[in-house]
């Protein structure tokens, strides 16, 4: 559950309606893989991830980033039940993929950076604070199976 005021919810949803999921998702996942290179081990089947340029231009990274961001968008519609919304993804990432749950927090923070880059002054400190609450809630929900 994410506790947002009515104004925060409106602001989060308002900005999200402008997000180009394919573009932002690919960039967010790509930046995660570049900034935190140990995360690449989960994506070895994606081909060349040897350089920042290779990662950022990799079509499989872009496609998976889009998939991840679509899932994030689904969560925005269920802020009062994120654990239920992400229960199956939490199980997959914990039991089958063995992803360190810290990576969910890292990706959330990278997403906030990418949103700030794309939206500039429109991404105000108050909006950032609201998105930080959301990405923390999503990361917590995805890590739920680990507890």
UniProtKB/Swiss-Prot annotation:
GO terms for molecular function: haptoglobin binding; heme binding; hemoglobin alpha binding; metal ion binding; organic acid binding; oxygen binding; oxygen carrier activity; peroxidase activity. InterPro entries: Globin, Globin-like_sf, Globin/Proto, Hemoglobin_b, Hemoglobin_oxygen_transport. CDD domains: Hb-beta-like. The keyword Chloroplast does not apply. The modification N-acetylvaline is found at residue 2. It comes from the Eukaryota. Keywords: Acetylation, Heme, Iron, Metal-binding, Oxygen transport, Phosphoprotein, S-nitrosylation, Transport. GO terms for biological process: hydrogen peroxide catabolic process. The modification N6-acetyllysine is found at residues 60, 83. Residues 3-147 form the Globin domain. One of its GO terms (cellular component) is blood microparticle. Red blood cells. The modification Phosphoserine is found at residue 45. Heme b binds at residues 64, 93. The keyword Ion transport does not apply. The modification S-nitrosocysteine is found at residue 94. Heterotetramer of two alpha chains and two beta chains. Involved in oxygen transport from the lung to the various peripheral tissues. Belongs to the globin family. This is Hemoglobin subunit beta. The lineage of its organism: Eukaryota, Metazoa, Chordata, Craniata, Vertebrata.
């Amino acid at each position: 559950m994410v506790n947002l005021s009515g104004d925060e919810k409106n602001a989060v949803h308002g900005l999200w309606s402008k997000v180009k999921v394919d573009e932002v998702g690919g960039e967010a996942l790509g930046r995660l893989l570049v900034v935190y290179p140990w995360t690449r081990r989960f994506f070895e089947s994606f081909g060349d991830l040897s350089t920042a340029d290779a990662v950022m231009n990799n079509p499989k990274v872009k496609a998976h980033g889009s998939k991840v961001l679509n899932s994030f968008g689904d969560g925005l519609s269920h802020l009062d039940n994120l654990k239920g919304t992400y229960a199956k993804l939490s199980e997959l990432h914990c039991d089958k993929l063995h992803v360190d749950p810290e990576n969910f927090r890292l990706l959330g923070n990278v997403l906030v950076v990418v949103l700030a880059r794309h939206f500039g002054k429109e991404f105000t400190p108050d909006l950032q604070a609201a998105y930080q609450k959301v990405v923390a809630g999503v990361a917590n929900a995805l890590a739920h199976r680990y507890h």
